[in-house]
Amino acid sequence: MGEASRDEYKIQSFDAETQQLLKTALKDPGAVDLERVANVIVDHSLQDCVFSKEAGRMCYAIIQAESKQAGQSVFRRGLLNRLQKEYDAREQLRACSLQGWVCYVTFICNIFDYLRVNNMPMMALVNPVYDCLFQLAQPESLSREEEVDCLVLQLHRVGEQLEKMNGQRMDELFILIRDGFLLPIDLSSLARLLLLEIIEFRAAGWKTTPAAHKYYYSEVSD
């Protein structure tokens, strides 16, 4: 789908003033407080998982616009500082809001997917993203379908990139996932199916084989 047809960036859920702020940041970043923009985007991402899936694309566009206009990175710095702050408080976030936690993981993985330095993923985000995924692979998280679903979706999205950046941690993560699949913890049938699917997805080189696609998607639809 072309960029022009997607320029709304799913910001309809913001109030009119904030929508205008974001639109200005995309077109004329020097005219707005970019640290405020970063905080607005993170705040909304923690509350709205639909937006958190889109936010990386918007952040990338603002970073590109600011770099082109002024050769600066005020927005990126503000965004990364706020991500670090939320990362440091992730255990409290998970304890008080499961939805906020899932939205945060979705958001940081989305940012990792979109932000590039010299056409490479940002090294500064590799370990924080891994740490979040490791938490999702703990037994108490695997007993919650929302966390299993988040884990599998994010590995589909950024697993291959993460493995290229640090293969040892990916091996360790999948040991946890396999243990969760095999050990007698309280896994729902859907969670067990999702874990098996991601194990086979990685084993096939981060690709879904036609047979696997047919099997898993028929199972989920049933």
Swiss-Prot record:
Coiled coil start-end: none
Location of the MIF4G domain: 3-205
Keywords: Cytoplasm, Nucleus, Translation regulation
GO terms for MF: identical protein binding; RNA binding; translation activator activity
Keyword flag Nucleus: yes
Main location: cytoplasm
Subcellular location: Cytoplasm; Nucleus
UniProt-listed GO biological process terms: cap-dependent translational initiation; regulation of translational initiation
GO cellular component: cytosol; Golgi apparatus; histone mRNA stem-loop binding complex; nucleolus
Protein family (similarity comment): Belongs to the MIF4GD family.
Cited PANTHER family: EIF4G DOMAIN PROTEIN, MIF4G DOMAIN-CONTAINING PROTEIN
Subunit structure: Interacts with EIF4G1, EIF4G2 and SLBP; probably tethered by SLBP to the 3'-end of mRNAs ending with the histone stem-loop, it also interacts with EIF4G1 which is bound to their 5'-end.
Role: Functions in replication-dependent translation of histone mRNAs which differ from other eukaryotic mRNAs in that they do not end with a poly-A tail but a stem-loop. May participate in circularizing those mRNAs specifically enhancing their translation.
Listed name of the protein: MIF4G domain-containing protein
